[in-house]
């Protein structure tokens, strides 16, 4: 399907959550962060969050999209405001690329990317989300482009150490519709 006339494009920064009810393309750039996409195939609405960390100890503070659990809660609230339920959405997970693999090998700590991946998968399980695709882990960064008019999510993954022309051959569409 061609890009509809009047399509809006939104670029998410780390910690942002966006939800749209009209033809929209959502974009973001991920390293160790993770993006969760929600797409409602009947209503052609949905959203994306770009979280940075698995969670925080918070008490009586506003929700903050920088944290996995809170970013998902914000998406769930958008779904509810639009008269839909989480079970009606196709959900996809992206990111969690290890950005400093050599450093990680020398230190006995876990990297943020792995913690983010585990948080995303645990939240998907806890909320019984309908996961249709995921592209997480490895090294390097990913450019994500999510088209709400058809649910396609395009991923360009640039692993650490790959030549630029090799990375372009790895472009893929995370269909799963």
Curated annotation (Swiss-Prot):
The keyword Hydrolase applies. Its EC number is 3.5.1.44. Probably deamidates glutamine residues to glutamate on methyl-accepting chemotaxis receptors (MCPs), playing an important role in chemotaxis. Keywords: Chemotaxis, Hydrolase. The keyword Membrane does not apply. Pfam families: CheD. It comes from Pseudomonas fluorescens (strain SBW25). One of its GO terms (molecular function) is protein-glutamine glutaminase activity. The gene is cheD. NCBIfam families: PRK13498.1. This is Probable chemoreceptor glutamine deamidase CheD. Belongs to the CheD family. It catalyses: L-glutaminyl-[protein] + H2O = L-glutamyl-[protein] + NH4(+). GO terms for biological process: chemotaxis.
